[in-house]
Amino acid sequence: MEITTKLEFDAGHRIPHHKSSCKNLHGHRYAIEVTIKGEIVVDELNSDFGMVMDFKDAKELIKKTIVEEWDHSFIVYKDDAVVLKFLQSLNDHKTVVFPLVPTAENMALVAMDKLK
């Protein structure tokens, strides 16, 4: 059985060396959908009886693990030296240094790894 939940957040990023305007600093409203696969709880005394996982618990886990860290941040690739230096010069700026170029695909990979 699978259940899917969705949360949203806002963040800035850029794709260094991209051929189009994605190489410029810009932002998006992101949506993250997480699908959880498991067995339905059959123990009638368990508060999750009849569920794979309580949606509230799933959303809280995703919120704490990903959304709170990435929301209203600038996500910068660790090897994007020019932008990283600029962001580090700002006081109290919410910067997330990313191990990969922050494309949607790589953000999904990092999110999946964080949720394992």
Regions found by a protein language model. Give the residues of each.
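Charge-rich, low-complexity N-terminal segments
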Residues: 1-116
